[in-house]
Amino acid sequence: MRKTLLAASALALAVAAPFASAYQAGDIIVRAGAITVDPNESSSDINVGAATLAGEKANLDSDTQLGLNFAYMVTDKVGIELLAATPFKHNVGMKGATVNSLVPSGKLGTLKHLPPTLSAVYYPMDSNSAFQPYVGLGINYTWFFDDELSSDAEAAGFRGLDMKDSWGLAGQVGMDYMLTDNIMVNAQVRYIDIETTGTTYLGTSKVTVDVDVDPWVYMVGLGYKF
């Protein structure tokens, strides 16, 4: 009986050993995977000069890129995390009778952006658990660049396109599942507050529109703990 108990205890320790310490203060975690920015946008009416085109709106499509996370554990349960990614590219569309009569395709142009986000992250589970859910809150800076008009928009007389950079809050929930003491599967969802103003010109008239991009950001990948 004693031998049976010892054998059972040894087996339990052997199984638990890989997860004896999921995270500890000082750990560095690197994650990589597919990340999708899915805009949940709403826009003001498009303004042309002093006129407002009622009901004429702007919109953005989604894009998927390589996402990267770098985290440092300040304590066993609290970490600081930086979100990075390869540049996202979105089509900028317009909808409404007036703008679509000018640009029938509805495509104003394209833009690229990088949304680095710095967050404080909390892991509520005990460190010996293989399953490590977490929540985070942080600040985002979105840098828009390579804003370009479509050929249809240029043919209609539009010139230049500029999107204003944005600061905003970001919240997230996620989970790691430890496959080994160092390797994990990760899934996470974020909501990021991104507000921007798009500016272009139609002839000599300035065209502007305010857009609350406010995307949901999804990422699935693998991670490694150093």
Label every model-predicted segment.
Residues 42-50, 91-101, 145-156, 197-206:
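Outer-membrane beta-barrel translocator domains and adjoining extracellular loop/strand segments
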Residues 27, 69-150, 213-226:
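Gram-negative (and chloroplast) outer-membrane scaffold detector with strong preference
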Residues 89-93, 180-226:
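Predominantly the C-terminal beta-signal and adjacent terminal strand-loop region
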Residues 1-26:
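Cleavable N-terminal export/targeting peptides
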Residues 67-71, 184-186:
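Short, conserved structural micro-motifs that define repeat-unit consensus positions
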Residues 21-69, 223-225:
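Short glycine/proline- and aromatic-enriched beta-strand/turn motifs that initiate or cap beta-hairpins
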Residues 36-38, 62-66, 86, 112-114, ...:
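Transmembrane beta-barrel architecture of outer-membrane proteins
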